[in-house]
């Protein structure tokens, strides 16, 4: 896969640490597939993440009890109403179910990062 393409990180995210991560997920998921990579910005524990997230963002959640050998997994965040949001898993391997939360709980979900650019594998 050619990942040498220059990708511009939006100005609002330049204060955060960024990295490239690979995904391993189910083949039946149309949004993220095996061997896809993503540029992820990582949040600090002290960051208020609510203003950094938009409807239908893909986030990285740290949860050791997610049912996979890894502490982290990706999920879609969807703001359903002005006072609540939903976390939807993007892999059938993750044991955690889709859940809805109050907006006040957004900083306690353990969202540690956000996918800002998906790099599709055409292998």
Residue map of PLM features:
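Acidic/glycine-rich C-terminal interaction modules and beta/coil loop segments
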Residues: 4-123
